[in-house]
Amino acid sequence: MRIVSGMRPTGKLHLGHYFGVIRNWVKLQEEHECFFFIADWHALTTAYKNTKELRQNIREVMIDWLALGLDPQKSVLFIQSLVKEHAELFLLFGMITPKSWLELNPTYKDLKYNLLRLTDLEKEFKEKLKERISEIVNLIPFNITKEEKFREHLLENLTQTMIEALFEGEIEPEILKRLNVSKRDFYETDTFGFLGYPVLQAADILIYKGEGVPVGEDQLPHIELSREIARRFNRLYGKIFPEPKALLTETPKIPGTDGRKMSKSYGNAVFFSDEKEEVEKKVMKMFTDPQKIRKNDPGRPEICPVFSWHKLFTKDEELVKKIEEDCRAGRLGCVECKRILLKHLEEFLEPIRERRRELEKRINEIEEVFYENSRKAREIAQKTMEEVRKAMNLP
């Protein structure tokens, strides 16, 4: 089976990337023909104004991929933007893809919903505030506000001042904070690139006639759209593309140090580039069961991020079982539990860290490997595009 998948270059990789994606890719490359690409064009859908670090981020992904076990001898590891045919097929797919299909994309729907919700909240807030201020203005003695224009002017100025002070100063920032986005980014993300990125994903997969795409459940709508586009193209111009299947694999969830989803933007991630001292700081500050304040307090391992990590890094199943039992019984304190975890986490991280150091010294050589793989990928992509142009009667 031909497997195709990609990853946006947002910087150095962390434990969440490994358990969510890379570990599965490493297994797949042993059994299938795999194409894994650094999706630098996709990075621009939400970060088109901040390209200063893009090239360095691409290098970091290259290093981490190889350090974590992806092998350019077993997989085609390449950079999306070096294969220009992705963009050509994206353009042609865009001609046949109804806009309504894209507007059903859950990610886009969420953006539009949040935009509308924020606008509605602002409108509702302003109207209620104006009503309240109007009541206050009406309480002012008539001889001070006998001029209607003065009354209106006073009402307008007070309303605007209160909106700036309350909504724009306190309420709106809190909403945007919960959405994890700045106000400018929030509005400027509503672009053609953001609307159309699922079509680019379809082109990424189908340019290699990908048959399988390893994804999580949240990506299923995108794979279904790729299948719809393939079907529509085949119906219009003749059978060129397979209908790719989603390869749903069970991946362990590794929470961040604060219990939320592990993310660079949340500041709760452990990176493969972190030195031992930095990892220790992060682990010792990890959130635990809030009800377990003292060592002899009974704990609830099922809600504790530290125990979730034990299940991944502490390989001795009997020890994991004992940690769970001792935590529940109040025989194991959180500090000691973290120190046990740290020992096993370091056994996992140190070999990867060492490989990373060696790879960093050979970055020019590694870049050339990715460039050469990109040339291999492009040869295949060019053959696909020859078939596409012929089917569409393009020169």
Curated annotation (Swiss-Prot):
GO terms for biological process: tryptophanyl-tRNA aminoacylation. Its EC number is 6.1.1.2. One of its GO terms (molecular function) is ATP binding. Pfam families: tRNA-synt_1b. Homodimer. Catalyzes the attachment of tryptophan to tRNA(Trp). This is Tryptophan--tRNA ligase.
